[in-house]
Amino acid sequence: MARKKPRELYAWIAKNHDASSIALCCAALGVRREGYYDWQKRPCRRERDEALVSALKEVRDEHPAYGVRSMIEALSERLKPSYGKGYIICREYGLLQKRRKPHGITKANPKALPAEDLLKGDFKSETPNTKWLTDITEMKCLDGKLYLCAVLDCFDASIVGFSMDINMKTPLCTSALNSAVKRYGKTEGLIVHSDRGSQFTSHLFRETLANKGFRQSMGRTGNCFDNARMESFFATLKKDLIYRLPVYKMNRAEVRHYIFEWTETYYNRKRRHTSNEQNLPPLVKRKLFQEQIQAAA
């Protein structure tokens, strides 16, 4: 049985010490008497900490993949602790997230000529639709694998387009790109960055980019950090949704529905992003940007 925390033992002593002396209770439970008296002198702080723990647990339930900073930002101003205290409480109460090492599933075509890396690790953008990232991930479902290709805008980390299919051939990627263009239009010279997977070096994908006036950019082979923000999105998707569902017991149509709903109603509209000013959700930041442009016109 796990040993109780000192504060829990102090609370028991405070409730039950009438039957015997405080010194005897402390000795029996293996805690310091001075610690008990110090604990008694800080009821206001205890109440604040209890309220903070309760609030952090609520944030974790609503946002399973939030890091400590985002959890703190989601709290009301009166409860916000320092990062150090927030981290200690999250660690003590099991609210920290375990990180999984990202791994790519695309394979490079050794005969294809890769595009130049135009981003060189710079995933920031001051305006929408100037830098898009794209990649593929997979989910193992009851009736086989489901593949997702998504397009992320570096401006606000929003998913501007995505496509799902039972295979990871090039049309999966062109479909995701076309869905982004359908939603936000074409911006001449827009950079589309990916890894060196054969889907992205294919004639069909490159022709699609050229027809839209887009520029292609590629990271190094086998280096996930060259497309880190895209990998981060897939990690968030899996922590928030996929790892919390019995995907292996669900058919692809069900999983497809969950991914669509999570992306459109939660990730783009509600989930805070530390990469955005004031940790704004993606489409909230985009809306504010558009309002500022209109006000300045």
Describe the role of every protein-language-model region.
Residues 106-110, 194-196, 202-205, 216-239, ...:
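RNase H-like two-metal-ion nuclease catalytic core shared by retroviral integrases
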Residues 2-7, 26, 33-127, 223, ...:
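Basic, flexible linker segments flanking DNA-binding modules
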Residues 45, 65, 78-79, 124-125, ...:
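Conserved, non-catalytic sequence blocks in retroelement Pol enzymes and Pol-derived host proteins
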Residues 210-214, 238-297:
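C-terminal domain-tail junction helix/linker
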Residues 121, 125-160, 166-168:
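An active-site-proximal beta-strand-loop segment
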Residues 140, 162-185:
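Active-site beta-loop-alpha junctions of metal-dependent nucleic acid enzymes
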Residues 1-29:
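Helical coiled-coil/dimerization "stalks"
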Residues 25-26, 36, 56, 71, ...:
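Mobile genetic element proteins and their domesticated derivatives, centered on retroelements
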